[in-house]
Amino acid sequence: MATRAWVAAAVALNPQLLPLRSCSPTKSVSPAQRSASMGLRLRSGRPCLGKFVCRRAKNAGYEDYKFPDPIPEFAEQETSKFREHMAWRLEQKKEDYFGDHVEEIVDVCTEIMGTFLENDYRGPGTLLVHPFLDMKGEIKERGLPGAPQAARAAIAWAEKNVDKDWKAWTGEY
């Protein structure tokens, strides 16, 4: 009974939520028969979590939204800014983490970031973690020190600047 009331209340509040199946039993069974058939298991008063379909989300047309293509000029400019920042940032921590390998680490990070911006970055919401994992992996593979610190510095810069610079470049504020 409580389940039916809960479903009715949910449908009344949001008619877009409709159950795919009913949570209530299909045949009418007395409570005594139900407890006997369930082997003395007690049922909680909570409604079962049926599968609900949100038609509003299903029909919202998310498939129709297309991110813009990458902009090569933007990628080139942003890669240049990234290189400058990484060289400056890693130079600050040279003694602690990177030693004499700052330039090599900056080259690895810049190459990966540039490739990502040229091929995969399509505006706000498309900055992925993969290039930063690739940076860390490549630095480690080459036997260079400070892979986690370099990747962390790259992520911090990208989160702060890339989407903001894209909006300024395209005029979308």
Curated annotation (Swiss-Prot):
Q: Which GO terms describe its molecular function?
A: DNA binding
InterPro entries in UniProt: PRIN2
For biological process, the GO terms are:
regulation of gene expression
Q: What is its main location?
A: plastid
Key words of the record: Chloroplast, DNA-binding, Plastid, Transcription, Transcription regulation, Transit peptide
- For whether the record's keyword set contains Oxidoreductase, the answer is no
- Subcellular compartments: Plastid, Chloroplast stroma, Chloroplast nucleoid
User: In which domain of life is the source organism classified?
Assistant: Eukaryota
What results from gene inactivation?
Answer: Pale yellow green leaf phenotype. Reduced levels of plastid ribosomes and defects in plastid mRNA metabolism.
Transit peptide, start-end: 1-55
The UniProt entry's GO CC annotations, sorted and at most eight, read: chloroplast nucleoid
Give the protein's function.
Required for the activity of the plastid-encoded RNA polymerase (PEP) and full expression of genes transcribed by PEP.
How is this protein named in the record? Protein PLASTID REDOX INSENSITIVE 2, chloroplastic
